[in-house]
Amino acid sequence: MRRKTSRQSPLKLISLNELLRPGASPDQSSSLPQRTAGRLARRAEAWHLENAALSLKLNFAYQRAGDAPIPGALVEVCGHLITSKDAPLKPHEFSVNSIEFLHRPQLAEPALSARRASRLAEAVALRARSNRDIRAFFDARDFLEVETPNWVEAAGTDVHLSPVSASFQDPHRSAKDAIHGQLHTSPEFSMKRLLAAGMERIWQMTKVWRNGEITPLHNPEFTLLEWYRAWEGLDAIINDVEHLSRVLLGNQARVGERAISLEAPFLRMTMQQVIEEACGFDILEATEFDALLAICTERKLLSENSLNRARKLHRWDELFFELEIDYIDPFLGTKGAVFVCDWPTPLAVLARTKPEDPRVAQRFELYIGGVELANGFQELTDPAEQRRRFEADLTARKAAGLPLPPMPERFLEALQWGLPPSSGVALGVDRFLMLKSGAEHIREVAPFAMARDPKTGKASWS
């Protein structure tokens, strides 16, 4: 496929990044011939040489049969930079003296191509900068970065999460000896085992998987940042989250076209206050299914379909999640940056209850512009109570006809050994990148995120 249209230049090949970087060295001035490379693209009636982040207009100063530019071709070009009078130090275009075709495209432009990559280049660079900032944030606070397995024996019992199954088959043993596991939905169980082993301040940024979730805010695989403080309360973690939010977002977040100021201290509300304002009743007087169903029915808060579905399952949390979609999320969308604290106990399987009010769990979530970003607990350390809650989850899963995952016995053993009083939080990195860039879909900040056909609903790989 390679064809040279001129003798190979003895000039050193200079990347577009180096050629166009601010403050280029004298040997990259417009008076000297240059050799660079990239992909050809047609833009606004002109040819350009591009990579994911940069585009340089080309001026073909010669005519030669067979040298016609080809959209998408990978090429090397030799010639001179041309600068404008108004910006003598900023290259305006490149006068091409010779061109070498390295590869001609053999198919139509793929989904992940130079054209799409050019739109994602800023987001990819933003992720790299954010990763550096996150690491510096925790280094400055004497946290230890840890790595735990992505493939685990038991990912959890949560009724509302569906783990991705994964198995190991030794080719030299029979199928009955296969080891069955799951891709973790969170590193929480493994990290708490490290807390029980004596580690006190730990953090991790990792990929996690949750089956079935493909929306503008969800992808089956996403990046989760999780950290824990042993011997410290929930206020310390909440302060961490607020400080890190400003490190990652600065003084402003963007939800699509909407700008949200982060200059003022983040608002704090209890879930009781949120529901009182959004729905007009006291959720702590309705922590049993029949009581909440009666309120939703009498006040006509939910549709008959939603009420009937909840009646069939006899699940308090189903009623709550319907209220969340119809009332709570829209209400929080009007509040800028807000920590929602003190959740009803049925919504916090892994959190401690408040000693003064067992109806309330020591849980918080951070919302900015109505987007849920972080979820934290004062961690439950009682192994018997934790097992009871897991068993209740499994009972609910069975009633709903859902698969029954294994009990997380190794995590429960760590609780039996002794988990120190601890607080922790999980934060969605991709969503923070969306709020930094104003992206409206997770695919804009995660180039390989899965897609769902809007007509058929079918999911597909990128």
Predicted regions and their residues:
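Short, glycine/acidic-rich hinge or "gate" loops at secondary-structure transitions
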Residues: 147-151, 251-263
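A translation/RNA-centric and nucleic-acid-associated enzymatic feature enriched
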Residues: 149-240, 269-462
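Class II aminoacyl-tRNA synthetase-like tRNA-binding/catalytic domains
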Residues: 2-236, 244-246, 329, 434, ...
